[in-house]
Curated annotation (Swiss-Prot):
Gene Ontology biological-process annotations: proton motive force-driven ATP synthesis; proton motive force-driven mitochondrial ATP synthesis
Family as reported in the entry's similarity comment: Belongs to the ATPase e subunit family.
Residues recorded as bearing Phosphoserine in the entry: S66
Identification of the protein by name: ATP synthase F(0) complex subunit e, mitochondrial
This protein's encoding gene: ATP5ME
Location of N6-acetyllysine modifications: K34
Length: 69
């Protein structure tokens, strides 16, 4: 087994700094995007509800207008 390699403290500091900055950036980006995504999901749900209602009405009209009464 190969012994562990000594890594410069400056390189370690750089790696951990980059890791911390990446985590901080991800957290702020998530907090920025989360409300926008919730709004998009709410709008999509409302549109789906409207489309379902229109389909239901069209289906009822198609059943009422059937030739085979």
């Amino acid at each position: 087994m190969v012994p562990p390699v000594q890594v410069s403290p400056l390189i370690k500091l750089g790696r951990y700094s980059a890791l911390f900055l990446g985590v901080a950036y991800g957290a702020t980006r998530y907090n920025y995007l989360k409300p926008r995504a919730e709004e998009e999901r709410r709008i999509a749900a409302e549109e789906k509800k409207k489309q379902d209602e229109l389909k239901r009405i069209a289906r009822e009209l198609a059943e009422d207008d059937s030739i085979l009464k």
